[in-house]
A protein has these predicted regions:
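Extended, low-polarity segments enriched in aliphatic/aromatic residues
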Residues: 1-143
Length: 143
């Protein structure tokens, strides 16, 4: 499973060269880090109304779309995409410290994954968190 949030969506403005290997979390995380660090977002809004577990791309991998949908009914927003993605990961019961692009961006000063330094307004993570299932259970052990 991939944690696909505000940082990675900001990086998908163009097609990546086919010769770049993004088949595992580490190389994909490095690509997302490099792309995002060129021009970080000023503000990010994440549509979390309908989530999809068993990713990435569960629909194209032949799994059951109907059973993989996660009706979250959330909108996440903030001035720092790393913080927004950290909250997204926690909502999915994933450890943001194990998401490669988040740890790389945090190390380079683009944001924090330390939840004690992130202000959440509205519903709290504990009120809305649901375990997402997927292949990378080390990142999302709640699955």
């Amino acid at each position: 499973m991939a944690v696909d949030g505000g940082v990675s969506q900001d990086c998908s403005r163009g097609q990546t060269p086919a010769y770049i290997d993004h088949t595992n979390a580490e190389t994909l995380g490095q690509f997302i880090h490099d792309s995002y660090s060129i021009r970080p977002a000023d503000f990010v809004v994440m549509d979390g109304l309908q989530g999809l577990q068993n990713g990435p791309a569960s629909v194209w991998a032949g799994t059951n779309y109907a059973s993989d949908k996660m009706n979250m009914r959330l909108i996440l927003a903030g001035k720092n995409a790393v913080a927004v993605d950290t909250i997204e990961a926690l909502v999915m019961k994933c450890d943001p410290k194990l998401v490669p692009h988040l740890t790389k961006l945090e190390a380079d000063g683009f944001g924090t994954t330390d939840v004690s330094k992130i202000t959440v307004v509205g519903k709290q993570v504990s009120d809305v968190a649901k375990p997402f299932v997927g292949k990378q259970t080390a990142i999302c052990p709640g699955s």
